[in-house]
Amino acid sequence: MNYFSVIMYLINSVIFTFMIFLTFVNPSLLNDQYWVYILIGFFTAIVFHSGYQAGKGSEK
């Protein structure tokens, strides 16, 4: 088990959840294109990381 990988996944998840919360509190953030790009980036990182971890687990 790669602890660095797990820690980075948790950090990404917490930041993404906090950003989604801020978006619900202040929907005008969606008018800022960079905010949307950052949200998409964090979501993509979480999805790719989940798939990578699942693929590593199935090799054993």
UniProtKB/Swiss-Prot annotation:
Species: Sulfolobus islandicus filamentous virus (isolate Iceland/Hveragerdi)
Protein name (database record): Putative transmembrane protein 74
GO CC annotation, single: host cell membrane
Signal sequence residues: none
Localization terms from the record: Host membrane
Gene this chain is encoded by: SIFV0074
Presence of keyword Membrane: yes
Major localization class: host cell
Alphabetical UniProt keywords: Host membrane, Membrane, Transmembrane, Transmembrane helix
